[in-house]
Amino acid sequence: MTNTTSPAILNPIARPEVPQELAENIILTSLNDVYDWARLSSLWPLMYGTACCFIEFAAMIGSRFDFDRFGLVPRNSPRQADLIITSGTITMKMAPALVRLYEQMPSPKYVIAMGACTITGGMFSSDSYSAVRGVDKLIPVDVYLPGCPPRPEAIMDAIVKLRKKIANEHINERGNLAQTHRLFTAKHKMKPVPPILTGQYLNAPSRQAPPPALAAAMGIAVPALGEAVSETTSVAE
């Protein structure tokens, strides 16, 4: 007696039918994609700020910008954070503390340099003796965010760019792509000039006595300029 049933087709042409239970509960992906998705969706920034740029970063915590939708959870301990936003001027005295905070963060960790003072020294780069001319001389930087200070919308854009960078990383290349060196910024081209606020404007005639037209309109008896200056000098003495 022969078997009349057709043998099973190993490679059918038709599209296989997937049950509804499996179609709604199974995701086909790779371990690397899940690893990147989990990290970019749960960045935990360190609550760290040294100057006025931190006010703009703190504004993102409110309901208007609500950075919780990006999965950001602010942490007060560097051992629980994987993102540090250097918001504000970094001084020579603060530099060792910043490096120590960065070293205490677990890997993989990321850095966003926020503000002109953090990137190049900003307005303190020409004549300040204590400002660090670029935080990338201390720790490696992943995203540069210029501005004085940057608006919260710009901070959100920097976070989006960092998320894209994390999404393109590979779990097997994490050690090879890690930044192990520090960068050195170029010298600025600013020319220092003599200060304009020297205090000489206090001796201007307009500060010693009101204008004659204003004094005549208000009926104020204005003494001579020499008498006003002598009286001011005697009172100061």
UniProtKB/Swiss-Prot annotation:
GO terms for molecular function: 4 iron, 4 sulfur cluster binding; iron ion binding; NADH dehydrogenase (ubiquinone) activity; quinone binding. Its EC number is 7.1.1.-. It is an enzyme of class 7 (translocase). The keyword Ribosomal protein does not apply. It is a peripheral membrane protein. One of its GO terms (cellular component) is plasma membrane-derived thylakoid membrane. It comes from the Bacteria. One of its GO terms (biological process) is aerobic respiration. Pfam families: Oxidored_q6 (PF01058). [4Fe-4S] cluster binds at C52, C53, C117, C148. It catalyses: a plastoquinone + NADH + (n+1) H(+)(in) = a plastoquinol + NAD(+) + n H(+)(out); a plastoquinone + NADPH + (n+1) H(+)(in) = a plastoquinol + NADP(+) + n H(+)(out). Its cofactor is [4Fe-4S] cluster. NDH-1 shuttles electrons from an unknown electron donor, via FMN and iron-sulfur (Fe-S) centers, to quinones in the respiratory and/or the photosynthetic chain. The immediate electron acceptor for the enzyme in this species is believed to be plastoquinone. Couples the redox reaction to proton translocation, and thus conserves the redox energy in a proton gradient. Cyanobacterial NDH-1 also plays a role in inorganic carbon-concentration. Belongs to the complex I 20 kDa subunit family. This is NAD(P)H-quinone oxidoreductase subunit K. The gene is ndhK.
